[in-house]
């Protein structure tokens, strides 16, 4: 006959023995080298083309030093980079001359110029975080799809910097009765230097 205290002691002994055996198994499993187990040592390597700079180049964006203009295309203040407004080559008014899809492509044109200006100032797109985008859309009075137009820029920044990481930004998308030289879209952005 077992007394209650003896039953608890045997249960404790069994649990303790089981823990010791599990610990031994973990030690044995951990003693194999990565080479023996067929696994590479260390963390997996990043796939080529995963840096923002390489992603942008993979999208076909060419980077070269820009000629100085009347104003600075990208200015640095502390750890922030502020771009000038970059107008699309596409001209016209959304809701009158152009469709939302055409406006979306015009916003991508602006994104390319923003990335070139940032690269020209900073020397690389790596090590940056997109903070804010301000998009201006040349709009007919009843046109209300400015956010869908500026998605063209945001989507490209997501492609380059990551939609849920460094490319995840705040944004304003506004309608204007006209833009300089009849441009369909003009966009400016703020970036943060992470390091």
Where does each model-flagged region fall?
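Intrinsic structural disorder
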Residues: 1-3, 19-22, 51
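Sec-dependent N-terminal signal peptides
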Residues: 10-24
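Compositionally biased regions
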Residues: 6, 16-18, 32-34, 38
């Amino acid at each position: 006959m077992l007394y209650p205290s003896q039953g608890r002691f045997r249960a404790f002994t069994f649990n303790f023995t089981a823990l010791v055996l599990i610990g031994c198994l973990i030690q044995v499993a951990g003693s194999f080298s990565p080479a023996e187990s067929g696994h590479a040592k260390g963390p997996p390597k990043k796939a080529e083309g995963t840096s923002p700079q390489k992603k942008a180049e993979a999208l076909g964006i060419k980077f070269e030093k820009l000629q100085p203009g009347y104003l600075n295309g990208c200015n640095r203040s502390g750890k922030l980079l502020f771009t000038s407004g970059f107008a699309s080559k596409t001209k016209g008014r959304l809701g009158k001359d152009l469709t939302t899809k055409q406006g979306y492509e015009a916003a991508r044109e602006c994104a390319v110029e923003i990335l070139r200006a940032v690269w020209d100032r900073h020397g690389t797109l790596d090590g940056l975080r997109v903070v804010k985008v301000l998009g201006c859309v040349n709009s007919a009075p009843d046109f209300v799809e400015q956010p869908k137009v500026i998605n063209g820029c945001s989507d490209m920044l997501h492609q380059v910097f990551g939609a849920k990481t460094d490319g995840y930004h705040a944004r304003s998308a506004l309608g204007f009765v006209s833009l300089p030289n009849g441009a369909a879209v003009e966009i400016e952005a703020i970036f943060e230097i992470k390091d």
